Amino acid sequence: MALLEIIHYPSKILRTISKEVVSFDAKLHQQLDDMHETMIASEGIGLAAIQVGLPLRMLIINLPREDGVQHKEDCLEIINPKFIETGGSMMYREGCLSVPGFYEEVERFEKVKIEYQNRFAEVKVLEASELLAVAIQHEIDHLNGVLFVDKLSILKRKKFEKELKELQKKQKHK
């Protein structure tokens, strides 16, 4: 396994619309394993392939259990996802490994139902609510070249751009 480099905003790579996965082979399995290792090392709960430079329609989500630990056997590997149903509405404070240090409230569906394939190309259906539903929507957005900051109001977006400039200035002076 290997740690992969996470691509940060404003890289144009993050705006790429990812392509459908067609080969469910050892290379894909290695990519999923490397993505999981990278996500855990970065203290994230979700990671889309495009965030590590792979323009493929796949993502992983590994929510921590009540003890705060993310167990590998709980990791969802979601490939070629499609929304079947969505419902409700909720606000959730989101962050992103590609936009480090910035968190903001985003409106999302409260419940989602998706169809996807696992690493063995088996078709699965998943119903999710609350945090898992939010994470699924956030990561699928990445597959479509959309970031959570794109969903902010104009006022919140200006706040984000200002904070980003300040952060970039600090990093230049280090």
From Swiss-Prot:
Keyword match Metal-binding: yes
Residues engaged in binding Fe cation: C96, H138, H142
Molecular function GO labels: metal ion binding; peptide deformylase activity
UniProt-listed Pfam families: Pep_deformylase (PF01327)
Gene: def
Cleavable signal peptide: none
Function: Removes the formyl group from the N-terminal Met of newly synthesized proteins. Requires at least a dipeptide for an efficient rate of reaction. N-terminal L-methionine is a prerequisite for activity but the enzyme has broad specificity at other positions.
Active site: residue positions: E139
Domain of life of the organism encoding this protein: Bacteria
EC number: 3.5.1.88
Catalytic activity line of the entry: N-terminal N-formyl-L-methionyl-[peptide] + H2O = N-terminal L-methionyl-[peptide] + formate
Enzyme's top EC category: hydrolase
Protein name from the UniProt record: Peptide deformylase
Cofactor: Fe(2+)
UniProt keyword terms in alphabetical order: Hydrolase, Iron, Metal-binding, Protein biosynthesis
Cofactor details (free text): Binds 1 Fe(2+) ion.
Organism (species): Helicobacter pylori (strain G27)
Coiled coil: none
Family: Belongs to the polypeptide deformylase family.
GO annotation, biological process: co-translational protein modification; translation
